[in-house]
């Protein structure tokens, strides 16, 4: 097992132990009631692991949704409980928080509850507020007329982002009256099954502009062959290490890279050489994971759109993504190549955005 996978599961287990000990101490309840609270907490976290180990496709769709949302939300709640108790422990060491506040304390318990409810009510409400990001690029006359493109990434449709959410997003997009819709991967979350049962493809077919997309890492997790069938039903043209030239849009060229999950994918330089420069006026690359941006710049790409990072989704994970990626969010430029790394319109795991924003991007080429 890769080291990151070990850390991914080990850290929450350590956090659960730390939080469980604090919850046991702080609750002003009898042993029986404290035991029940701890068992409930462990059960919620165990669902997170169980979802990964056993999968959800064998469970009825309503129950699968409950298991996914409870299990994955518990991971974020655990993160913030850990941080809160660390702050309280530090306060106790500095004699700013009395020890009685953390032991059999009504005031301590109510304070922790109020802080957590406040954080996650805000985080959930903020998630549903989709930001419209306006981006304008001057092509110096390389496109015959102004073009409007709506771009999004990381939809993560499935057990927690159902058809009703996609319907809202389609309404946002159609209201823009775009010439083109571009999606930078992770359309599907962990399984194509809920998309098939809900006929989510019907919502994509409501889009009033051609749709082009590249694959993300989650398309591989969900079973790439089944995902490809869904894309065909939805009317999405998936560009997998291929380019398409659009003469009806002034010979705009869209290049879609396979996800870096595939170690044998073509380089961006190879893809740029696959078409004649005389037949393109402007090139846009869709590449889900924003690694090695310098290679796109060296290959002469005009604009690259990526996602994957979610900008950490919640603070302070956004600090980690900043450390990992050359650009983990927003606009960026290398030489003459422009980049935009999106935080995503959807979300993985719990539906919380804390310190980050869900968004879709409206790009105008002029």
Region roles according to the model:
Residues 1-128:
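Non-catalytic terminal accessory segments
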Residues 116-142, 158-164:
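Hydrophobic alpha-helical transmembrane segments in integral membrane proteins
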């Amino acid at each position: 097992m890769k080291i990151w996978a070990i850390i991914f599961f080990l850290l929450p287990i350590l956090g659960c132990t730390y939080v469980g000990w604090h919850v046991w101490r702080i609750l002003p309840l009898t042993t029986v009631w404290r035991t029940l609270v701890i068992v409930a907490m462990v059960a919620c976290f165990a669902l997170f692991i169980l979802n990964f180990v056993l999968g959800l496709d064998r469970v009825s769709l309503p129950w699968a949704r409950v298991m996914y949302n409870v299990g994955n939300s518990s991971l974020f709640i655990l993160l913030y409980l850990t941080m809160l108790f660390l702050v309280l422990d530090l306060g106790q060491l500095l004699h700013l928080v009395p020890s009685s506040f953390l032991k059999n304390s009504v005031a301590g318990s109510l304070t922790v509850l109020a802080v957590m409810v406040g954080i996650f009510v805000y985080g959930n409400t903020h998630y549903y507020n989709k930001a419209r990001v306006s981006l304008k690029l001057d092509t110096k006359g390389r496109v015959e007329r102004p073009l409007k493109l709506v771009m999004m990434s990381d939809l993560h449709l499935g057990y927690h982002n159902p058809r009703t959410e996609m319907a809202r997003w389609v309404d946002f997009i159609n209201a823009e009256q775009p010439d083109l819709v571009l999606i930078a991967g992770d359309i599907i979350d962990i399984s194509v099954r809920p998309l098939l049962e809900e006929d989510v493809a019907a919502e994509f077919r409501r889009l009033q502009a051609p749709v082009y997309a590249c694959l993300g890492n989650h398309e591989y997790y969900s079973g790439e062959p089944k995902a490809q069938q869904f894309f065909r039903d939805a009317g999405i043209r998936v560009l997998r290490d291929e380019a398409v030239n659009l003469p009806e849009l002034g010979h705009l060229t869209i290049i879609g890279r396979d996800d870096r999950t595939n170690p044998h994918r073509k380089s961006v330089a190879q893809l740029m050489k696959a078409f004649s420069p005389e037949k393109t006026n402007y090139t846009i690359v869709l590449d889900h994971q924003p690694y090695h941006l310098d290679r796109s710049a060296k290959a002469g790409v005009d604009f690259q759109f990526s996602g994957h990072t979610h900008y950490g989704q919640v603070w302070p994970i956004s600090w980690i993504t900043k450390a990992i990626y050359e650009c983990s969010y927003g606009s960026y430029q290398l030489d003459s190549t422009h980049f935009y790394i999106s935080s995503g319109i959807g979300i993985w795991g719990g539906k919380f955005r804390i310190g980050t924003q869900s968004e879709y991007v409206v790009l105008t080429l002029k």
